[in-house]
C-alpha cells in the first residue's frame, strides 16, 4: 500500500482477483474500492487496516496497515506596506502566491515571495498561497495597505525667505 492524502493505493504483488476490505470499518467517511484497494475520502494522518483475500481453491488473507499522508500546511501571514504587503510563510515553504481576486489598481504580486508592490495605499488585497507538496492546500489571507502619511505643506513668502505651514 502506498499512502495518499486521503487514504492509500494498493499494489498487488500476489494473486490478482481478490477482494479488498477494511479490517475495521473507519469512522471518518473513508471508502475502499473492493477490487483495486484504492482508499478515498478519508482523513489525513489516519491509519487504516486493510485486508486482501484471494479467491480460488486455497484462499489466503493478508492484512496491512497504512497511514494516510498529512496535508501540507499552507499557513502564512501578511504585513501591510504602503503599496501592498509582505508575506511570511509559517507553514510549508516553496508554494505559489497569487491574488485571490485580481486587483484593478496595478498591484502585482511576486509568486515566490508574496511581496505586493505597485498598489494603492488603504487598499485591501486578498492573497492566496498554495503549497506544492504531496498533499497541496491553499490558504487565503487579506491585507490592507497602510494609509500614506500626508506630507503636504504651504509656503508663505516673507522678506527673507518664507514660512512653512504644515
Please name every model-derived segment.
Residues 63-69, 140-148:
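Short beta-strand edge segments in extracellular beta-sheet folds
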Residues 45-56, 122-133:
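Append "Rare intracellular matches occur via the same short Y/T/C beta-strand/loop motifs
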Residues 1-3, 70-80, 146-155:
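Proline-enriched interdomain boundary motifs that mark the N-terminal boundary
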Residues 19-36, 96-113:
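Low-complexity "stalk/linker" and mucin-like segments enriched in Ser/Thr/Pro/Ala/Gly
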Residues 16-20, 48, 93-96, 125:
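Short beta-strand/loop motifs in extracellular/secreted proteins, especially
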Amino acid at each position: 500500500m502506498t499512502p495518499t492524502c486521503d487514504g492509500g493505493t494498493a499494489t498487488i504483488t500476489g494473486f490478482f482477483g481478490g477482494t479488498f476490505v477494511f479490517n475495521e470499518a473507519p469512522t471518518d467517511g473513508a471508502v475502499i474500492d473492493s477490487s483495486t484497494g484504492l482508499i478515498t475520502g478519508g482523513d489525513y494522518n489516519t491509519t487504516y487496516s486493510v485486508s486482501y483475500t484471494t479467491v480460488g481453491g486455497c484462499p489466503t488473507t493478508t492484512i496491512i496497515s497504512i497511514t494516510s499522508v498529512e496535508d501540507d500546511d499552507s499557513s502564512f501571514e501578511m504585513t501591510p506596506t504602503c503599496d501592498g504587503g509582505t508575506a511570511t510563510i509559517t507553514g510549508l515553504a516553496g508554494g505559489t502566491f497569487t491574488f485571490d481576486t485580481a486587483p484593478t489598481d496595478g498591484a502585482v504580486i511576486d509568486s515566490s515571495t508574496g511581496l505586493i508592490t505597485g498598489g494603492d495605499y488603504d487598499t485591501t488585497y486578498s492573497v492566496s498561497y498554495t503549497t506544492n507538496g504531496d498533499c497541496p492546500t491553499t490558504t487565503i489571507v487579506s491585507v490592507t495597505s497602510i494609509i500614506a502619511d500626508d506630507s503636504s505643506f504651504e509656503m508663505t513668502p516673507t522678506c527673507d525667505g518664507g514660512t512653512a505651514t504644515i
